[in-house]
Amino acid sequence: MRIDRIELRELPMRLRFRFQTSFGAEQDRRILLVTLFGEGLEGYAECVAGEAPGYSSETIDTCWTVIESFVAPRVVGRSFATPDELLHALAPIRGHDMAVAAVEMAFWDLQAKAWEVPLWVALGGHERQV
């Protein structure tokens, strides 16, 4: 699967219910959406980093920078047969697991579309209901 480009978008999201943790309460979130484009298809994933470095040292802003400055140059214009190949190319990027995972998940989505199977099948699922 050849990766032609990566697009990053920030989306505001109001939560249906206030989310309370030991780090505080959230009603609104910033979402980083990662889109991989390849072979006429699009793969999507959400980066799960938060706005502040509380739960993790990664944030929406650091993930954006890492994907744009370090991940994209390692994957755009290259072909990967499997997610493992993609992760091998990204192995030198250390300490930014949420950023790398978002790109990996977008690749899984892209690959499932290329295989014309649901993502749960591409990930090895066997049953429709759990």
Named regions from a protein language model:
Residues M1-V130:
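N-terminal capping/lid subdomain adjacent to the active-site entrance of alpha/beta enzymes
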